Swiss-Prot record:
Protein name: Argininosuccinate lyase
Gene3D superfamilies linked to this entry: Fumarase/aspartase (C-terminal domain), Fumarase/aspartase (Central domain), Fumarase/aspartase (N-terminal domain)
One Gene Ontology term, aspect cellular component: cytosol
Principal cellular location given in the protein's record: cytoplasm
Subcellular location: Cytoplasm
E.C. designation(s): 4.3.2.1
Enzyme type, top EC level: lyase
Keyword vocabulary terms for this entry: Amino-acid biosynthesis, Arginine biosynthesis, Cytoplasm, Lyase
Metabolic or biological pathway, per its Swiss-Prot or TrEMBL entry: Amino-acid biosynthesis; L-arginine biosynthesis; L-arginine from L-ornithine and carbamoyl phosphate: step 3/3
Catalytic reactions of this protein: 2-(N(omega)-L-arginino)succinate = fumarate + L-arginine
Length: 456
């Protein structure tokens, strides 16, 4: 089949080489955007008097037929035509004849593909933003139901201080809020039209780039045509933001994987988000959480791949940029699905509140409470720290915990200790009293929840 750019060539191409150079297997995802861009472009050509209105009407009608066929799944693409742009132009030619050739006036595939990608990413990011907003709602609802659920707080994966489970959930709420802000703020750099930049230097035709941008719903146009077709920083920014978002999902998934284990038993995931073993009948595996954790590396890889593709490219377009799409498509799908799966896991998981709280009674996470107690009695904190550290060592040697130590022994250690120490050492008291702003105290959590709700 004759190629649309074949005038300069004499030799015939070979199918296996065509297959290597073709991108239609993946860039056909942008068929909708490519047709939308062409409709805006032909409208602009007509408005500016570059092509007659009658021909513009023919082209427009043909493009709308292709839109209908696309919606019905009736468009067939070929690797002979390389990419989505040439495939659609060929299909348009089959619909309306030679006038289809006028569509490409004052346009290059360089600005055409950049336009498609801006349109595609803009819509897809909007959908991710909605899913992220839903996840934040789920976290707030789960936190609101668990304000007084006590759990161990960890450092180094060792019991550190008791906290409210709601406090833990709201920590992730803060992280996902920043993820949301990053994505929302990045939209203004996606929402820019490169259409009309042509190959790299603009065009000799009297086009109206602002008009085509307006038709496509863009809020701005690239001020420099070379910039418009050369860079993919808007994709890199999305991949970077996605990597941070997936990192947050992965960290929480790691905790869910630990918490569902027999050693923790803090939470139980519903059957829908779990799988079994082909040999061990008792197994209930947190596969969805593990997959999100695993897919995080995949998203990182897409970011590094894109950075590597671009790092040595001179301006303007180079065929290397064909490699800018699959990583973007894959990341969009991965992030979208991961968010939806994760929200479902959090929304439906069972919290074993008694086991969570009991675990805070079988450790020394209340040691800080004893040190603070002594400090409030006038003992310098460093001295109090030393006293409590030695007592913890003594307790571990005797197989008991701080709440098991007799009052008489406490008073031997320091006569300032009174019988109110046992209230101080309770997990609930330890949590309740941490009422500094942003702390885990119940009153502070209620404030945090109200503040969070205002941002939903």
């Amino acid at each position: 089949m004759e190629k649309l750019w074949g005038g300069r060539f004499q030799g015939k191409s070979e199918a296996w080489i065509d297959d290597f150079g073709a991108s239609i297997s993946f860039d056909q995802k942008m068929a909708k955007e490519d047709l939308a861009g062409s409709l805006a472009h032909v409208a602009m050509l007509s408005k500016c008097g570059i092509i007659p209105a009658s021909e513009a009407a023919e082209i427009t009608a043909g493009l709308k037929i292709l839109q209908e066929k696309l919606a019905l799944g009736e468009l067939e693409f070929s690797t002979v035509n390389e990419d989505i742009h040439l495939n659609i132009e060929k299909l348009l030619h089959e619909e309306i004849g030679p006038v289809a050739g006028k569509l490409h006036t004052a346009r290059s595939r360089n600005d055409q593909v950049a336009t498609d990608m801006h349109l595609y990413l803009k819509q897809a990011v909007a959908e991710i933003i909605q899913s992220l907003k839903h996840l934040r709602v789920v976290l707030v609802q789960k936190a609101e139901a668990n304000v007084e659920t006590i759990m161990p707080g960890y450092t180094h994966l060792q019991h550190a201080q008791p906290i409210s489970f709601a406090h833990h959930l709201l920590a992730y709420f803060g992280m996902f809020t920043r993820d949301l802000e990053r994505l929302e703020e990045s939209v203004k750099r996606i929402d820019i039209s490169p259409l009309g930049s042509a190959a790299l230097a603009g065009t000799t035709f009297p086009i109206d780039r602002a008009y085509s941008a307006e038709l496509l719903g863009f809020s701005a146009i690239y001020e420099n045509s070379l910039d418009g077709v050369s860079d993919r920083d808007f994709i890199i920014e999305f991949l970077s933001n996605s990597s941070i978002l997936m990192m947050h999902l992965s960290r929480f998934c790691e905790e869910l994987i630990l918490w569902t284990s027999h050693e923790f038993q803090f939470v139980e995931l519903t059957d829908a988000f779990s799988t079994g073993s082909s040999i061990m009948p008792q197994k209930k595996n947190p596969d969805m959480a593990e997959l999100i954790r695993g897919k995080t590396g995949r998203v990182y890889g897409n970011l590094f791949g894109m950075l590597t593709v671009l790092k040595g490219l001179p301006l303007a377009y180079n065929k290397d940029l064909q490699e800018d799409k699959e990583g973007m498509f894959d990341t969009l799908e991965t992030v979208q699905t991961s968010l939806d799966i994760f929200a479902g896991m959090i929304e439906t998981m069972k919290i074993n509140t008694e086991i969570m709280e009991e675990s805070t009674q079988k450790d020394f996470s209340n040691a800080t409470e004893l040190a603070d107690y002594l400090a409030k009695k006038g003992v310098p904190f460093r001295e109090a720290h030393e006293i409590v550290g030695k007592l913890v060592l003594e307790c571990t040697q005797n197989g008991i915990y701080l709440q098991d130590v007799a009052l008489s022994h406490y008073q031997e250690i320091n006569p300032l200790i009174d019988d109110d120490i046992y209230v101080v050492l309770s997990s609930k008291t330890a949590v309740q009293k941490r009422n500094s702003y942003g702390g885990t105290g119940f009153d502070q959590i209620k404030v945090a929840l109200e503040n969070a709700k205002k941002t939903l």
